[in-house]
Amino acid sequence: METSIQQLQQEIDGYQIRNAKELEAFKLEFTVRKGKIAGLFGQLKTVDSADRPRIGQLLNALKLSAEAKVADAESLFAQNAETEAPALDLSLPGRRSFLGSEHPVQKVLGDMKRIFTAMGFGIATGPELELDEYNFDRLNFPPNHPARDMQDTFFITRGQEEGDVLLRTHTSPVQVRVMLDEKPPIRVICPGKVYRNEAISARSYCVFHQLEGLYIDKNVSFADLKATIYSFARQMFGSDVKLRFRPSFFPFTEPSAEVDVTCYLCGGKGCRVCKKSGWLEIMGCGMVHPNVMRNCGIDPEEWTGYAFGMGVDRTALLRYKIDDIRLFFENDVRMLSQFMA
């Protein structure tokens, strides 16, 4: 028995393991449950009881020797695999990163700015948190006007000495600040975010973007206003766009009008979006009310002017033929990615 152990030890020591295939063959021959080492352990019961402890120690040493040879071979193969791994190929092209896109509302707003600045309008901005004085009083809103009610306006504080503080309901306060700070002639557009306490639906939202325009000079007429709006509409919606002006009322303009374009979905035939009328409103406009000019320190006997205002989000709906304004505020990448340049 001792001689057999010595012979098997010599076989293990002399066994060459150069690859994974030879390693697997070594395991099958020596270390598996039916291998040579296990066979010798099976013969241990035939050994004289006096010699059995010593022979058992020799067998355990033989088993450990075989297991150590397997472990050394596996470690060596693992190291070789790491060193033989292909190096980083710096000539390979980089992975293309995902590029976002400009939001459709911002795209439309950018186009609006370019159109009006090409006409000679400057750009003015102001605070979104406003005083009642600039949002209503100086714009000729009477004290009992519905817009002053909490059902329509987000008030921050009320009854303060400096006046009520609110989230602006339009960008007209920017026009007021411009008229107070600058002398005519004035030609500006006022883009920005506005807030109204409205029910959220496919056509309205509690926060949206607005662009208003103001032009004050000598002998400005309603014909000048119409020419400006026609020029804008053709550049924004195409040369074949049709417009109509409807008489309306706004506290800050007189006379006042609302401007409609043919419905983008039905082409003027009438559908759900245009409420079967064939027209969609895009803006309000009119000649600046004399009271507004007086409130801002401008003499209406010397100067005249026009103003207009439109929803940027609604204009984006028209341009891209989208029927739900809420899509602009959900930040759904599936929708926004359609507007990549």
UniProtKB/Swiss-Prot annotation:
Record text on cofactor binding: Binds 2 magnesium ions per tetramer.
Family: Belongs to the class-II aminoacyl-tRNA synthetase family. Phe-tRNA synthetase alpha subunit type 1 subfamily.
InterPro entries: aa-tRNA-synth_II (IPR006195), aa-tRNA-synth_II/BPL/LPL (IPR045864), Phe-tRNA-synth_IIc_asu (IPR004529), Phe-tRNA_ligase_II_N (IPR004188), Phe_tRNA_ligase_alpha1_bac (IPR022911), Phenylalanyl-tRNA_Synthase (IPR002319), tRNA-bd_arm (IPR010978)
Subcellular location: Cytoplasm
Superkingdom, taxonomy of origin: Bacteria
Keyword Magnesium among UniProt keywords: yes
GO molecular-function term, one example from the UniProt record: ATP binding
Binding site for Mg(2+): E254
Protein name: Phenylalanine--tRNA ligase alpha subunit
Assembly and oligomerization: Tetramer of two alpha and two beta subunits.
Main location: cytoplasm
Cofactor(s) in the UniProt record: Mg(2+)
Keywords, ordered alphabetically: Aminoacyl-tRNA synthetase, ATP-binding, Cytoplasm, Ligase, Magnesium, Metal-binding, Nucleotide-binding, Protein biosynthesis
Reactions catalysed according to its record: tRNA(Phe) + L-phenylalanine + ATP = L-phenylalanyl-tRNA(Phe) + AMP + diphosphate + H(+)
Native source species: Chlorobaculum tepidum (strain ATCC 49652 / DSM 12025 / NBRC 103806 / TLS)
PANTHER family the UniProt entry points to: PHENYLALANINE--TRNA LIGASE, MITOCHONDRIAL, PHENYLALANYL-TRNA SYNTHETASE
EC numbers on record: 6.1.1.20
Principal EC category: ligase
GO cellular component, one term: cytoplasm
Gene: pheS
GO-annotated biological processes: phenylalanyl-tRNA aminoacylation
